[in-house]
Amino acid sequence: GVGFSYEETDNGYDITVTENPGETQRTGTLTINQTDEGGESVSVNLTQAASVVTYDYTLTATPTSLSFANTGETKSFSVVSTKQKKLNGNVSGSAVDVAFSFEVAGSGFSKSTGNNVVATENTTESERTGVVTITQSESDEVDTINLSQAAATVTYDYTLTTDPTSLSFVAAGETKVFGVTSNKQKKVNGKNSGSPIAVDYTTVVSGEGFTKGSSEYSVIAAANTGAERTGQAVV
């Protein structure tokens, strides 16, 4: 039989068998023939167990973390998913690919075609986090990729205008009012968010004969008995 050999000794025979590289049992026969005139023979059946077949599984994702811009974007990752066959603990052949699947968890994150993760725009003022969980189909191997996305960039555009830009008063004196637009517009990632919000303001009036009225948007001119007077209201 394949793999079997013998050696005669003083007490009989030593049977030697090489390692079985196959996945099936091997068999053989030892036949002993009588050399004298009797001519009798006897046979000994030989068996050898099949190889012990095991597999070493590997599952590695690269990179181990992905960071996304707050405006949203798509990023990819790579996966090495293989198994290495071993016979009796020894490597047999080359590693072969093993299928895998992945799931994405976390607000604003989702899976896309291929090994891609999509992050939608983050309009919140806090960082978002998530995780990709990769599972090998033939084993219990699992690997993960941590996900993070920057918080939204929040800015404000301020507006301050007056209407009209000049006031004329009669010599007898009078009070006049002017319009003021004072607000701020919130922007998230450079885009308007919500409606403008009013912003408080103060007014300082200068110039002889001119004073601030009862509101921040009024000016009082006292009676003028002399030459033309000028002043300024700074908002």
Predicted feature residues:
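Beta-sheet-dominated interaction scaffolds and their linkers
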Residues: 54-80, 154-181
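Surface-exposed binding patches on compact interaction domains or structured appendages
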Residues: 1-16, 83-117, 179-218
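Surface-exposed loop/turn motifs at beta-strand-loop junctions within extracellular Ig-like
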Residues: 19, 34-36, 50, 83, ...
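Extracellular and select intracellular beta-sandwich modules with Ser/Thr-enriched
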Residues: 39-47, 140-146
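A short beta-strand micro-motif common to beta-rich folds, especially ectodomain repeats
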Residues: 24-36, 126-138, 228-235
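Interdomain boundary/hinge segments at the C-termini of tandem beta-sandwich modules
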Residues: 46-54, 147-154
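Short, surface-exposed loop/turn segments at beta-strand-coil junctions that are enriched for proline
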Residues: 18-24, 120-126, 222-227
